[in-house]
Amino acid sequence: MKDSFLFTSESVTEGHPDKMADQISDAVLDYIIERDQKAKVACETLVSNGFCMITGELKTSVYAPMQEIAREVVKKIGYTDALYGFDYRSAAVLNGVGEQSPDINQGVDREDGEIGAGDQGLMFGYACKETETLMPLPIHLAHQLTFALAQKRKDNTLPFLRPDGKSQVSVRYENNKPVSIDTIVISTQHSPEVSQKHLKEAVIEEIVYKILPKEYLHDNIKFFVNPTGKFVIGGPQGDAGLTGRKIIVDTYGGSCPHGGGAFSGKDPSKVDRSAAYAARYVAKNLVASGVCDKATVQLAYAIGVIEPVSIYVNTHNTSKYSSTELEKCVKSVFKLTPKGIIESLDLLRPIYSLTSAYGHFGRELEEFTWEKTNKAEEIKAFFKR
């Protein structure tokens, strides 16, 4: 008997208010880390109707021109006219950034050269064989749709689109394998002149059908494009945006647990970010090595402590090896101290703006070192001993 179910994931465009906040926070981080690799950065951003507030804590000798950084991000996204709900030229930018607490810093920067974890917490990584990038199919497709919304807007293929938007993809699984697409939801901000009929037809023809893999298509897919009938007011005019509110969009679309820590605006001494990247690196290499078809990896840390307090591997009954054996392999092959993660993944670089929209995982860019499968052979060798 077939075990059949639907699973759904969503994505948002770079013009979504929460993603605007993430991108501003990461742009601040990139500006600082490019000039001061020892900097400690925890940058939070709020965008709302006509203004942006940047806050958080820093430990750096670098002066960051917050107004210029924020305005450039908003301009690049495409909020270049007040009619879109936000304008990079006229929006107020408030700077409320303070200094990092010395109580925290004393546990992170150590005299022996090691780095203690910047906070306690648990982080998850995940990989599976549903796509070439070893990501779950629903979130993979959802990101492709939102990215295409932005590209078709920017290249004027669909000039009536505006920056804010979302996608949602429901996939049918049988015996834990994706077999078809059931439902596509796309909500996109648009100019007031375009008819909903034209918008729906254009989005489906120019974006959806050009993105979706043919093997998952059929005649009964349900399409909902702007199901409320109108989406003119968008961006920060429609909803306030905050850094760190799209943590499921940023990761695996709900396919695995989440430890709760957001990524954007945090330098790699914060294990919320760096250890989540490391957990993806571990999970992806386990699957790429062939020791399992699916892997969920949990790492946990204590503030100021060098080694992880726990490592857990769940292969969802797709491996002949036990969790105990896999944990030993992970400890042997990967460096999972904060310093080990930072060095092995080369994280002290201004790469974070690239991560802040369309997912931190499953995008095989040169800068995304945690997406490499260069540990797969070491994993194979470990189990041949």
Swiss-Prot record:
CDD domains: S-AdoMet_synt (cd18079). Residues 100-110 are annotated as: Flexible loop. Its EC number is 2.5.1.6. Mg(2+) binds at residue 18. GO terms for cellular component: cytoplasm. It catalyses: L-methionine + ATP + H2O = S-adenosyl-L-methionine + phosphate + diphosphate. One of its GO terms (biological process) is one-carbon metabolic process. ATP binds at residues 16, 164-166, 230-231, 239, 245-246, 262, 266. GO terms for molecular function: ATP binding; magnesium ion binding; methionine adenosyltransferase activity. Binds 2 divalent ions per subunit. Binds 1 potassium ion per subunit. Pathway: Amino-acid biosynthesis; S-adenosyl-L-methionine biosynthesis; S-adenosyl-L-methionine from L-methionine: step 1/1. SUPFAM superfamilies: S-adenosylmethionine synthetase. InterPro entries: ADOMET_SYNTHASE_CS, S-AdoMet_synt_C, S-AdoMet_synt_central, S-AdoMet_synt_N, S-AdoMet_synthetase, S-AdoMet_synthetase_sfam. Pfam families: S-AdoMet_synt_C, S-AdoMet_synt_M, S-AdoMet_synt_N. Its main location: cytoplasm. It comes from the Bacteria. Its cofactor is Mg(2+); K(+). Belongs to the AdoMet synthase family. This is S-adenosylmethionine synthase. The gene is metK.
